Amino acid sequence: MSIFNQKSKFKIKTEIRTVRETVERPKLKASTSSSSIPTTGSSQHSNVRIAGAGSSLSRASSTPRLNGTSHTTSTSSSARASLTKVTTIPTARRIQSASPIPSINGDGRSSRKRRAIKASSRSPISPHFSEDSDSDSNGDENWEDNLDARKRRKRVHDERPVDVNRKLRHPKIWKGEEADQVERIPGPAIIHAAKVASLEHKCKPALGLKNEEVAVRLQYPGARYPERYELVEGKDKIDAVKDIEKVVQLAASTYLTDEEGKIFLDHQTGILRKLVKSKNRSDGPGFKAALREYNDEFLKLMRKGVIVRNLDKMHGIPRELVDFILDQVYDRTVAPRVELLAKYQNGSDNVYGELNHPFISDILERTNLTSDKVFVDLGSGVGNVTLQAALEIGCESWGCEMMENACNLAEAQYDEFLARCRLWGVKPGKVRLERGDFRKNEKILEVLKRADVVLVNNQAFTSQLNDNLVSMFLDLKIGCKIISLKTFVHDNKNAENDVATSILDVEHLTYPEGYVSWTGASGTYCISTRR
C-alpha cells in the first residue's frame, strides 16, 4: 500500500488564535490498488565503475563547463560510491572497463566480453569478466530521460575541481577548411575498428545488412578523417553499433553546448534517437542514413571552428569519455592478444593483475593530482594506469614494467593512445613507458625524486621486493603519496630496521567490489605519505 493511502495513526494539535483544541487529522480513504513503497537498495553488479575517491554519496563541487565557468552538481548514490576507512559502500552504477579486462555497463558502452585468460585458478592473474547486462528492450522506453539536457550534463561533468592550468585542446586538432589552405595535416594513424572486427575476421553482418552493405565511416571531433567501421557482430569483437552510438553521444554532449547539440540529442528528432530506433528495429539502412546525417552535421560544426572554440573553454575531460577512449585503445591493441598476459612465473614478482578504471579515478582524485604534477606507476603492466593518469589529469605520467609481453602490449597501447587522443582533439599529459627492473632503471630512479604520486600494485610482490621499495622511498620528496595494495609498515612496531615506520604515515582504506581485475570482491589498500 502506498504511504499516501495509509490511515493516519497520529493526532496533531492545530493552534487557533484564541482557542486551543485537539484536532484529529482526517482519515484518508484506503486505495484499492496495491502499490509498494519504492526503495533504494544497494543494487549490486559484479564489475563496478565508480567515480571519485573519498566522495560521499551526495556531494556538490565545482566542475568545468563550456563557458569556462564552474557549476555545482550533486551526485547520488546511484552514480558514485565512497571509499571509507571502515566499510565498503555497496557497489553503484558506474561500471566500466578496466585493466586488463574492461567490463560492461548499461549506458551504451561496448558490450563484448574480453577473451578469458585460461588461468582462473591462478589468482591474481585472472581478469574478472561480467555478463552483458544490456538489452535491446530498453531502447526507446527511457529515451527522454536518458537525453534530458540536465541529466546529460550531469553525466558528462565530473565532481573534480577545475584545473585551470590544463590546456585541453590538442595542438594538431583540425581547425576547419581555412587550416587546410595553410597546411593539410595527415590524419592520425589509428587502428580502424574494421581492422579488428570485420567480415574478414569471420564476423556476421548486423542489423539485417548484406555483406556489401556493412562498411561505414564515423566522424570524430578532432580530425577531418573518419574511422572505418563494419556493421558486424561476433564473439569477443568490437560491437560496432554500440561503439558508434557512444561516439555520437559523447561527441555531442561533451564538445557542444545544449543548443548546438540539440540536433543530435533532441528527445524526438535527434540523430542519436534515430540511431537507437534503427538498431532496435534491426533497420540497417535507417541506421546508416542516421550515421551519414551525424557525420555531415558534425563536420559542418567542425568547419566553423565550433569544436576548437568550445575546447578552449574546457579544462577537463569527463570520466565517461576518459574511460571510453581508454577502452577503444584497449579493444584495438590488447584485447586481440590478451592471452599473452596469462604467461607469468608463479610465485614470483612477475604476476599480472590490474586496478580497474574507477579505482584509478578514485586514487587520482583522493591524492589531489593535477596537470602540473608527476605520477609514477611501478609495475605498470600494459600501461593502463599510466595512460589514464595522463588523459584524465593531463599530468606527466611514468610507468615501468619488466614483463616482456606486457611491455610489448603497453607500447602498442601507447601508439594507439596518442593517435586516439588526437582523433578526439584532446591533449594528454606527457607519457613515458620504461622497460626493465624499476629498482635499476636510472630514469625511474631519477623521476621518483620529483614524483607527487607513486602507485605500487604490490598485491603479489615478495617481501624482498617490498623491502627494496621502502629503500627507494627514502628518495621521495616530503608529502609524496604512495598508493599500495599492502602496507610497507611491519605489524611489529619494534621490528629492527623498520625504515617504513620512520618515514611513512599510513592510511588504511577499503575499496568496493569490482575495483581490481583478479577478483570481484572488495578489499583494502593503503595511502602512505612520505614525511
UniProtKB/Swiss-Prot annotation:
A Gene Ontology MF term for this entry?
A: histone binding
Reaction equations catalysed: L-lysyl(79)-[histone H3] + 3 S-adenosyl-L-methionine = N(6),N(6),N(6)-trimethyl-L-lysyl(79)-[histone H3] + 3 S-adenosyl-L-homocysteine + 3 H(+)
Q: Which InterPro entries match?
A: Dot1 (IPR021162), DOT1_dom (IPR025789), H3-K79_meTrfase (IPR030445), SAM-dependent_MTases_sf (IPR029063)
One Pfam family, short name please? DOT1
UniProtKB keywords: Chromatin regulator, Methyltransferase, Nucleus, Repeat, S-adenosyl-L-methionine, Transcription, Transcription regulation, Transferase
- Binding, S-adenosyl-L-methionine: 352-355, 375-384, 401, 437-438
Q: How is its activity regulated?
A: Ubiquitination of histone H2B to form H2BK123ub1 is required for efficient DOT1 methyltransferase activity on histone H3.
Cellular compartments annotated: Nucleus
* Gene Ontology biological-process entries: DNA damage checkpoint signaling; DNA repair; methylation; subtelomeric heterochromatin formation
Ion transport recorded as keyword: no
Q: Where is the composition biased (Polar residues)?
A: 79-102
Q: Where is the DOT1 domain?
A: 214-531
Q: Name one GO cellular component term.
A: nucleus
- Annotated stretches, region: Disordered: 1-146
Say yes or no: keyword Nucleotide-binding present. no
What CDD domains does the record point to?
AdoMet_MTases (cd02440)
Q: What is its EC number?
A: 2.1.1.360
Its domain of life reads Eukaryota
Q: Where is the composition biased (Low complexity)?
A: 31-62, 69-78, 118-127
Where does this protein have compositionally biased stretches of type Acidic residues?
132-146
Query: According to its UniProt record, which protein family does this protein belong to?
Result: Belongs to the class I-like SAM-binding methyltransferase superfamily. DOT1 family.
Function of this protein?
A: Histone methyltransferase that specifically trimethylates histone H3 to form H3K79me3. This methylation is required for telomere silencing and for the pachytene checkpoint during the meiotic cell cycle by allowing the recruitment of RAD9 to double strand breaks. Nucleosomes are preferred as substrate compared to free histone.
Q: What is this protein called?
A: Histone-lysine N-methyltransferase, H3 lysine-79 specific
Please name the source species.
Neurospora crassa (strain ATCC 24698 / 74-OR23-1A / CBS 708.71 / DSM 1257 / FGSC 987)
